[in-house]
A protein has these predicted regions:
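Short, low-complexity N-terminal intrinsically disordered segments enriched in polar/charged residues
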Residues: 13-62
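Residues that form generic nucleotide/phosphate-binding pockets
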Residues: 39, 43, 82, 86, ...
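Hydrophobic alpha-helical context, especially transmembrane and signal-peptide helices
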Residues: 1-2, 66
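A solvent-exposed, acidic/Ser-Thr-rich amphipathic alpha-helical stretch
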Residues: 50-106
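A beta-strand edge to alpha-helix "cap/lid" segment located at domain peripheries
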Residues: 19-31, 87-159
Length: 159
């Protein structure tokens, strides 16, 4: 298990609070696999824009990169806007991790399910993340069933 350097004894909620209240930003003190799950639950499931923005700043490098079969975006605002588009295209859908994430040497992957809460496996896939200095530097999303699968037709592109 790789531990990301940060403030000893910090928890995710306190880090989010520090970012919201004081603008502080430090690397997380959690194992990378736990951050992969938190990425789904605290960022991609979060409907509150302020909390999501704080979580993005807590978990992603400022110059991060995100790519799926539909588009690629850069930076915190790019990730934030991508999640907004996902929520607009699929109201009420949620992500759930499918089993534990695995990680080594700054690379991690997390299988997931996405859909209505009562049928959360409507769309499945895997996130692959590259970590640098304790933050997600790049996140690549692969949707089961081929490039973009059926989601590509329903997930609007940016700009």
């Amino acid at each position: 298990m790789v531990i990301i350097p940060a403030v000893a004894g910090a928890d995710f909620a306190s880090i989010e609070s520090d970012i919201i209240m004081h603008g502080k930003r430090t690397a997380m003190s959690f194992a990378i696999p736990d951050l992969m799950s938190a990425n789904l639950l605290r960022i991609f499931n979060e409907r509150n824009r302020r909390r999501r923005a704080a979580a993005i700043r807590a978990m992603y490098a400022k110059d991060c990169f995100f790519a799926d079969a539909i588009e690629s975006v850069s930076g915190w605002d790019g990730v934030h806007d991508k999640v907004d588009r996902l929520h607009a295209a699929h109201p009420g859908f949620v992500f759930q991790p499918s089993g534990p994430a695995v990680a080594h040497h700054g690379l991690a992957c997390q299988r997931w399910r996405f859909g209505p809460p009562d049928a959360c496996d409507a769309i499945t896939g895997i996130d692959v993340a590259i970590f640098e200095k304790g933050f997600i530097k790049a996140l690549y999303v692969f949707i089961d069933g081929g490039p973009g699968a059926s989601l590509a037709r329903r997930w609007p592109r940016s700009g």
